[in-house]
Regions:
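Acetyl-CoA-dependent GNAT
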Residues: 3-76, 84-89, 93
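Conserved GNAT acetyl-CoA-binding A-motif
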Residues: 94-104
Length: 104
């Protein structure tokens, strides 16, 4: 199931940072993630399975554009179209927004 994250807790931000570190070997600090989600600068979409986050897509909103910060899926859950579904959520969000473009 996909959830859009626009409000965060310390625990959620810590889980997101751990997932990113597990996927890529580096991650935003959980305090930064928490603050930037809660101030509206970052938005995350997460894919949960059995109450565990197994994939995510993160964006940063700027004045006119959306910047994709990262997208990833745990190796054990790949080839199930999770990244595609997360990207479709972003596109739907973009289509009803006032942003000009999506940047990588």
């Amino acid at each position: 199931m996909i959830k859009k994250i626009e409000k965060s807790t310390n625990q959620l931000a810590d889980n997101l940072a751990k997932l990113e570190k597990r996927l890529f070997g580096t991650a935003w600090d959980s305090v930064v993630i928490n603050n930037k989600i809660n101030n509206g600068e970052f938005v995350y979409w997460v894919f949960e399975q059995d109450n565990q986050i197994v994939g995510y897509l993160a964006i940063q909103k700027t004045f006119f554009d959306i910047h994709i910060l990262g997208i990833g899926v745990l190796e054990s859950h790949r080839n199930n179209s999770i990244a595609k579904k997360l990207t479709q959520e972003l596109i739907s969000y973009f289509e009803v927004s006032d942003f000009n473009k999506i940047l990588l």
